[in-house]
């Protein structure tokens, strides 16, 4: 062993002695090279994300115009976490969560942890406490724009508070990012959009809360309504495009198209018909859809209805589509507490 290697080994021992075992290691020795994920609750979005769902221990930003389906996307993820036996928390800074709608989407509202804080500082302190407990698998904050700093709440109408919210978010994310990674919590920040005044060229849209969230996010999703879904003259929902604007774990810029039905959320059958037809699991000939030589409906809506009524066939098609896209759940880890996550509070 040469002098350089001996010096390095001595330094590594000193670091581990001072900061604990596992504080530094060779990347090849890291036991968690595969990215562990939790399904988003949408097959199309799982495929667009490239790794089969939201990566655990990472920050996700979901933004878009008003009533585009941002909260719906987050609630589907919560339902998926709860279905796997995990714990989810919802920090409702907007004070606008509809429990009945959440229940329709599959959320177990009896088990969902809910907080409706008065100030941005309170919301982020609650978020930090939940993350550092190591017992929360998913945390949703709705929304960043509603995280109003205490100084603004206590001040007068019309007072200028330049950059307060951006500083608040920057400080909070510096504290949260490490704990989120260690605890394997998925932190979903819902955000709104604003428009810069006087922008003549380029996109005038920006998201509130400064630049910190853009940098700390592993995945950024842009949610926008594409068109209305009608039955006769009645509007039943919206076709929505979810664009993966940023992705640190897979190629970005993929787009998931989903049907968000009023009162029901994302239509599993709608996205399944589209994705299955794309990889020839379902055959589309003219207006007819067929599966294993058997016709399942004339027109997309009839095919959706057939799958809704025949859940065994729907699940079989879903599994085949996941295998075609190679997201059959190989990177799913059980949601359970670990010694590392439970010791987060002791590290402080």
UniProtKB/Swiss-Prot annotation:
Keyword set, alphabetical order: ATP-binding, Cytoplasm, DNA damage, DNA recombination, DNA repair, DNA-binding, Nucleotide-binding, SOS response
GO biological process per UniProt: DNA recombination; DNA repair; SOS response
InterPro entries listed in its UniProt record: AAA+_ATPase (IPR003593), DNA_recomb/repair_RecA (IPR013765), DNA_recomb/repair_RecA_CS (IPR020584), P-loop_NTPase (IPR027417), RecA-like_C (IPR049261), RecA-like_N (IPR049428), RecA_ATP-bd (IPR020588), RecA_C_sf (IPR023400)
Gene Ontology MF: a single term: single-stranded DNA binding
Top-rank taxon, per record: Bacteria
Biased segments, Acidic residues type: 336-348
Residues that hold ATP according to the record: 64-71
Subcellular compartments: Cytoplasm
Annotated Gene Ontology cellular component terms: cytosol
Main location: cytoplasm
Region listing for Disordered, in residue ranges: 325-348
Gene3D superfamilies (alphabetical): P-loop containing nucleotide triphosphate hydrolases
Keyword Disulfide bond: no
Family affiliation: Belongs to the RecA family.
Stored HAMAP family: RecA
PANTHER family, sorted: MITOCHONDRIAL DNA REPAIR PROTEIN RECA HOMOLOG-RELATED (PTHR45900:SF1), RECA (PTHR45900)
UniProt protein name: Protein RecA
Organism: Listeria welshimeri serovar 6b (strain ATCC 35897 / DSM 20650 / CCUG 15529 / CIP 8149 / NCTC 11857 / SLCC 5334 / V8)
Gene encoding the protein: recA
